């Protein structure tokens, strides 16, 4: 008997609250790669350049990472990451900006505060189920593009040169439909997980 684990990602959202005069501002983002993470963190640090801490955790293609950013070790990033993993989230970055209010919370309350940040933002957000799929290149011409079958796929890049090259995220079933349409050459770049459908948990 096989155990099937459903994986989910999440749509971008923001939440904030205050505990003992410290403000916690939480963001959650859908990410595709480490470049997304770097860009998001740079934008946040520019916008909140006077914050005390920028704590974050992410799960990307089932690889995970967290940082406490000068909070006591294990009290900040890890609690956020644990909540992400508990909810089977993937391709997700959660960032908590803290403005220290002058009152030290202590290790236990601080851990609970960061856990609350992650839990609340997830409850407020749209969850999207993931399924197995592919990142592909479709090499065709303008006639082929006009004859694309009406299927769910995410076109992430278009290159119009001598030939038209679309970079597409697509699930297995729709890849077969695209192949059977015979509108061009298909190259599989890599196996990935793609969005399945929107749902609230």
Task: Briefly describe each language-model feature range.
Residues 79-124:
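Active-site beta-strand/loop microenvironment that shapes enzyme catalytic pockets
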Residues 126-142:
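Short glycine-/aliphatic-rich beta-strand segments at the starts of folded cytosolic domains
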Residues 137-154, 177-178:
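Short amphipathic alpha-helix segments
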Residues 33-35, 141-145, 169-176:
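Helix N-cap motif at beta-to-alpha junctions
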Residues 113-122, 140, 186-201:
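Terminal alpha-helical anchor/extension segments at protein ends
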Residues 6-75, 157-162, 172, 187-201:
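C-terminal regulatory domains involved in ligand/effector binding and gene-expression control
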Residues 162-172, 176-184:
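Long, charged alpha-helical interface segments
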């Amino acid at each position: 008997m096989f155990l099937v684990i459903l994986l989910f990602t999440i749509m971008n959202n923001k939440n904030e609250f205050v505990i003992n005069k410290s403000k916690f501002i939480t963001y959650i983002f859908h990410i595709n790669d480490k470049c997304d993470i770097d860009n998001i963190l740079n934008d946040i640090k520019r916008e909140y350049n006077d914050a005390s801490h920028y704590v974050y955790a992410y799960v990307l293609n089932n690889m995970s990472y967290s940082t406490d950013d000068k909070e006591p070790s294990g009290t900040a990033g890890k609690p956020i990451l644990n909540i992400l993993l508990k909810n089977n989230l993937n391709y997700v970055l959660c960032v908590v900006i803290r403005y220290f209010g002058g009152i030290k919370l202590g290790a236990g309350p601080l851990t609970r505060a960061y856990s609350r940040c992650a839990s609340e933002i997830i409850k407020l957000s749209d969850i999207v189920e993931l399924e197995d799929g592919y990142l592909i290149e479709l090499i065709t011409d303008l006639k082929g593009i006009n004859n694309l079958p009406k299927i769910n796929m995410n076109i992430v890049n278009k290159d119009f040169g001598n030939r038209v090259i679309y970079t597409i995220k697509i699930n297995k079933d729709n890849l077969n439909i695209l192949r059977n349409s015979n509108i061009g050459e298909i190259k599989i770049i890599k196996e990935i997980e793609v969005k399945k459908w929107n749902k609230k948990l």
